Amino acid sequence: DEFSNAIAILPVETSYKGIIRETIDNLIMTKNQNIQILAETVIPVNDCILSKTTEFYSVMGLIANPNALGKCKKFIKDEMPRELNIVMADSMDDSARLLNNYNLTYSIIGTHKTAELYNLNILKEHIEDDKDNNRRFIVIGDGTTQSTGNDKTSIVMFLDDRQGALMDIVQVFVKYNINITHINSKMMNNRAEEQAVFLDFDGHKDDEVIQSLLADLENNCKSIRVIGSYSRF
């Protein structure tokens, strides 16, 4: 009920791969100016071996995407058959769908949710190499949040592609002693000589110092849009 106006939960960062570029690009390019980040959460990753069979020792095949294989290399090498038949898939969901085309000796890499959605058995858990692997998600929707005193704000700025443009922006944050927690930039394909800069930083857009910061930033870029202020996880 807290986020009844939420429309999606999107993965934004993983310990293994870092920032998920597709999510950031979609936030930058969205045409709906009312879409805001309402919250963030961090969920530990629990990769599992899933199959239609109930016996791990009978597994002779694995369907997975390159990312999943990369995260679980040690387990695959140490615990699965040496002559393992690997079938490449585009995504975790794609792996689960492809599994229907194979016999009971095939398995996939997935999560508890994948097992629930596709009615699969969990044969092994926590097979990822990095046991501290986490995934950060954001909740987006049409709305705003109140300041809690422990907040983060996300913005996108459009700058001329000139030497020193990004440094000018960083200096504004130094001026107000505001900590930048993430910065990511990309060239705009449909706008010559312009770059979009996505930033996360400490504070809420309703805080007096952040309002002063945003006003100052506006004088140093072509345009700026606040994508959300939300409680830090």
Predicted regions and their residues:
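Domain-level signature for soluble enzymes in the chorismate/prephenate branch of the shikimate pathway
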Residues: 1-233
